[in-house]
Amino acid sequence: MISVNGGDVYGHDTIGAFIEGRNVTLSDFSISKYLVTRDLYFKVMYDDKDVNAWPSRCEYNQTYRGEIMEGEKDSLRPVESVSWFDAVYFCNRLSKIKEYEPVYSISDIKRNTVYSIISATVSQDLTKNGYRLPTETEWEYAARGGDVTVEDWNFYYSGADSENAGAAIDSGMDAVGWYNCNAETGVTTRRIPSTMHGSHQVGLKKPNRLGVYDMSGGIFEWCWDWEHAISTGSTLDPVGPDSGGKKVLRGGSWLHGWAIYCGVRLRLSSEPQTSTDYYGFRIARSK
């Protein structure tokens, strides 16, 4: 886990968590250096008796995921095809293993008979010290390096800027992340490859200023928040609305979208029961 010092952010962007007219105060928190890997997910979930967490998703399947890139370990690729409900359930399981207080209260669980939690009643208590999903604001703050006084804060990607930032195809992404025009070799081409390796082992690209890897590209990351319009004004540790239709995802992916979608200010959203092979997550903790 990487320690992140909170602070005050006076927004000046047109999109993202720190828009013009929004003043955010964030408390200190920590965030995982890497996305949750298949190996970690399997170890935490394999003996679960309450919900079938389909740990077999963590086993290599070339037909489903494509060939592993030479030199990479499948166990160190990010776990994927996890719903938002699966992610919060994992956080509680890991908290219990580490003897921390679970952050989430989860009840009324319903699952797909094959593998995934598709419905549950979930609430969070941020006074608890266990693992959790980062809020959207925490995620963006960490992705931008956690320091508004340095140039990294204004980079388009997490840990890198580019003269072509905002373009569909951008070799400036090659240093820090995987997207659909470099997903086969790690080097941007002018076309989307006809075959791809899928996700890649975590930590192979350059980290950002905080030492956090793969926050631009790779796979989209679930955040806690329901999708909502970001409002102006002053706010302390925002967590978004209490209800909604879709949960926020951040970061971009190897498959969905161009380099533009890997920017640290951009968001995707999806129904919390959705699970697909370019959705995953990383974990956070309050301090």
Which functions belong to the PLM regions below?
Residues 2-3, 30-35, 78-81, 132-134, ...:
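Structural recognition of the beta-strand scaffold that forms the well-ordered cores
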Residues 11-17, 223-236:
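Cytochrome P450 core scaffold surrounding the K-helix E-X-X-R motif
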Residues 200, 206-208, 241-287:
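Disulfide-stabilized, aromatic/cysteine-rich ligand-recognition loop
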Residues 121-126, 170-216, 268-271:
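Short, well-ordered junction/capping motifs at the entry into regular secondary structure
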Residues 25-166, 173, 228-229:
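Active-site microenvironments of metalloenzymes and redox enzymes
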Residues 1-5, 10, 128-131:
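GGW-centered surface loops in extracellular recognition modules
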Residues 11-28, 54, 186-205, 260-274:
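Short, polar loop/linker segments at the starts of domains and inter-domain junctions
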Residues 50-57, 176-178, 227, 238, ...:
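Proline-centered structural pivot motif
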